[in-house]
Amino acid sequence: MSRFTYAYMMMTRLETLKNNLQAAFGQDLALTESLGELTLEVAAEQWFSACTKLRTDPALRFESCIDLCGVDYLTWGNGTQPEEKTGPVTRGRYAVVVHLLSIEHNWRLRVRTWAPDDEFPMVSSLLECWPGVNWFEREAFDLYGIVFEGHPDLRRILTDYGFIGHPFRKDFPLSGTVEMRYDPEQKRVIYQPVTIDPREITPRVVREDSYGMGR
């Protein structure tokens, strides 16, 4: 199979998927295409029902959820200073993103929803749609504090059980809040306030002016 033939097949399959999504969701469809990939945006109140349709509709058949993650858009589009906001406006601070695969139709889809409350981000659990997201949702809860309503065992999975805060949030201090060490007097591991002084790190590129130019 030539590269041209393969590219044509991929484009045809992408158009078929777009048409099938339009037929399934109608006026509720919010679809974007970039770099040969489709992203479907779903309102939080339709998160579970939309994902169920994506899995069960014979024309879509996304049997497998290969990834689920949280995203914190707090500083999205910002420079090093708060007033330097140049990026696009988002629908909220926290989003949940899933990447789906249809083995039957051999196509993929990214689906995103926004938590409606920035102070207490919560969306429905997708455990009944794809049981494999169990630990993915626990990870997003642990690192971002996103609550998945209906999850039967929403506990931390990566950090300590007594950990305070959610380390992947953009406002979580880079140095953390506590550090641990072994105390020889108490003969056990103890926690104490972190002793690292936080500082702003501004990335910059240092290179010769003639870098990359012909010599």
From Swiss-Prot:
One of its GO terms (cellular component) is plasma membrane. The keyword Cell inner membrane applies. It catalyses: a quinone + NADH + 5 H(+)(in) = a quinol + NAD(+) + 4 H(+)(out). Pfam families: Complex1_30kDa. Keywords: Cell inner membrane, Cell membrane, Membrane, NAD, Quinone, Translocase, Transport, Ubiquinone. Its main location: membrane. It comes from the Bacteria. It is an enzyme of class 7 (translocase). GO terms for molecular function: NADH dehydrogenase (ubiquinone) activity; NADH:ubiquinone reductase (non-electrogenic) activity; quinone binding. It is found in: Cell inner membrane. Its EC number is 7.1.1.-. InterPro entries: NADH_DH_suC, NADH_quin_OxRdtase_su_C/D-like, NADH_UbQ_OxRdtase_30kDa_su, NADH_UbQ_OxRdtase_CS. It is a peripheral membrane protein. Gene3D superfamilies: NADH:ubiquinone oxidoreductase, 30kDa subunit. NDH-1 shuttles electrons from NADH, via FMN and iron-sulfur (Fe-S) centers, to quinones in the respiratory chain. The immediate electron acceptor for the enzyme in this species is believed to be ubiquinone. Couples the redox reaction to proton translocation (for every two electrons transferred, four hydrogen ions are translocated across the cytoplasmic membrane), and thus conserves the redox energy in a proton gradient. Belongs to the complex I 30 kDa subunit family. HAMAP family: NDH1_NuoC. NDH-1 is composed of 14 different subunits. Subunits NuoB, C, D, E, F, and G constitute the peripheral sector of the complex. This is NADH-quinone oxidoreductase subunit C.
